[in-house]
Amino acid sequence: MTIIRKKHPLIKMINHSFIDLPAPSNISSWWNFGSLLGLCLMIQIITGLFLAMHYTSDTTTAFSSVAHICRDVNYGWLIRYMHANGASMFFICLFLHVGRGVYYGSYNMIETWNMGIVLLFAVMATAFMGYVLPWGQMSFWGATVITNLLSAIPYIGTTLVEWIWGGFSVDKATLTRFFAFHFILPFIITALVLVHLLFLHETGSNNPTGLNSDTDKIPFHPYYTIKDFLGVLILLMVLMILALFFPDILGDPDNYTPANPLNTPPHIKPEWYFLFAYAILRSIPNKLGGVLALILSILILALMPLLHTSKQRALTFRPITQTMYWILVADLLVLTWIGGQPVEYPFIIIGQTASIAYFAIIVILMPIAGMIENNILNLD
């Protein structure tokens, strides 16, 4: 078996990536989320494939076809709720994975980090288009509002929006193309994940100390395969509790009303995992400014390697920047809450304050904190 594992062209690649891979001996459970994201992607592709077998991407039958899946298809309700809540689990793992990268300075592996940002955008695009497919009220109005933001682009905006819609409003053509893109994107994401891993294995994993771990490596299997398996069990348990006991807790009740272009819901809002970005978008009165802030709220991650001023890589031994980091986490939770609230006092001013704080912490406060910590270390 050892000979095949090390000699066979295909198995050799798997061996170098998941079995004989040298890994730092001290990586904590925060390093589990990469494998959990891979699992989430697999769950989404498999459940999505079965849903696509029964779904029809036509405005007249889309809503009914989803109801048909839940009522008439064997275990269709389970497949549908695993797919819907699987998306939420995907984003929870994504946010924790990115948060880990920011905390431990993993952004210094620039190729891996930038590939991760591309993946984040791709997953967000996929999730957005997937939310449109059931063709409920929030699906329709969410698609209308978010695609309409592109009209803020000078000169080509209006033409671009009508080109994406395939007409003068979100309609049959829009739904069909969104289904096509929603189907193909996860496979593109899978290819990007392989590139992400390729870049990661060029440098090797980071670790909680932020120090070079070449002197103390252990094989990935069995140490981290068994550790990842525990994470897998916990993820599946949480997903099944969500899908079986609270299937609609993260959804919007408005999406159980078929799409009606003549009736606008009182509060248009996206799924919970987009609320922080939606709050930043809404906190700027200007349309183009809001769109730019929305894109920057994610793209700012690409600036992190440039904004790194500390002589240390991780935040493990940096209490001042640690404080900034946890304030940033709290700020993101506030933004998520604000994104789901109506546009009125006091939510507007809270959202604007939280948006300013978000960018200020990343661009100004954390780099300054890094320099202060450098000076403290130089005092002797």
Curated annotation (Swiss-Prot):
Which CDD domains would you find in this protein's record? cytochrome_b_C, Cytochrome_b_N
* Pfam families (UniProt xref): Cytochrom_B_C (PF00032), Cytochrome_B (PF00033)
Q: Where does a ubiquinone bind?
A: H201
Q: Which SUPFAM superfamilies match?
A: a domain/subunit of cytochrome bc1 complex (Ubiquinol-cytochrome c reductase), Transmembrane di-heme cytochromes
Q: Which GO terms describe its molecular function?
A: metal ion binding; ubiquinol-cytochrome-c reductase activity
| Highest taxon, organism lineage | Eukaryota
Q: Which annotated residues bind heme b b566?
A: H97, H196
Localized where? Mitochondrion inner membrane
Cofactor annotation remark: Binds 2 heme b groups non-covalently.
Q: Which residues cross the membrane?
A: 33-53, 77-98, 113-133, 178-198, 226-246, 288-308, 320-340, 347-367
InterPro entries hit by this protein: Cyt_b/b6_C, Cyt_b/b6_C_sf, Cyt_b/b6_N, Cytb/b6-like_sf, Cytochrome_b, Cytochrome_b_C_euk/bac, Cytochrome_b_N_euk/bac, Di-haem_cyt_TM
Where is it predominantly found?
Answer: mitochondrion
Please tell me where heme b b562 binds in this chain: H83, H182
A single Gene Ontology CC annotation of this entry is: respiratory chain complex III
For this UniProt record, the keywords arranged alphabetically read as follows: Electron transport, Heme, Iron, Membrane, Metal-binding, Mitochondrion, Mitochondrion inner membrane, Respiratory chain, Transmembrane, Transmembrane helix, Transport, Ubiquinone
Any GO BP: mitochondrial electron transport, ubiquinol to cytochrome c
Topological relation to the membrane, as annotated: Multi-pass membrane protein
Cofactor names from the entry are: heme b
* Task of the protein: Component of the ubiquinol-cytochrome c reductase complex (complex III or cytochrome b-c1 complex) that is part of the mitochondrial respiratory chain. The b-c1 complex mediates electron transfer from ubiquinol to cytochrome c. Contributes to the generation of a proton gradient across the mitochondrial membrane that is then used for ATP synthesis.
**PANTHER family given in the database record:** CYTOCHROME B (PTHR19271:SF16)
Additional remarks: Heme 1 (or BL or b562) is low-potential and absorbs at about 562 nm, and heme 2 (or BH or b566) is high-potential and absorbs at about 566 nm.
Report quaternary structure and partners: The cytochrome bc1 complex contains 11 subunits: 3 respiratory subunits (MT-CYB, CYC1 and UQCRFS1), 2 core proteins (UQCRC1 and UQCRC2) and 6 low-molecular weight proteins (UQCRH/QCR6, UQCRB/QCR7, UQCRQ/QCR8, UQCR10/QCR9, UQCR11/QCR10 and a cleavage product of UQCRFS1). This cytochrome bc1 complex then forms a dimer.
- Protein family (similarity comment): Belongs to the cytochrome b family.
**Protein's recorded name:** Cytochrome b
What species is given as this protein's source? Alexandromys oeconomus
Q: Which gene encodes it?
A: MT-CYB
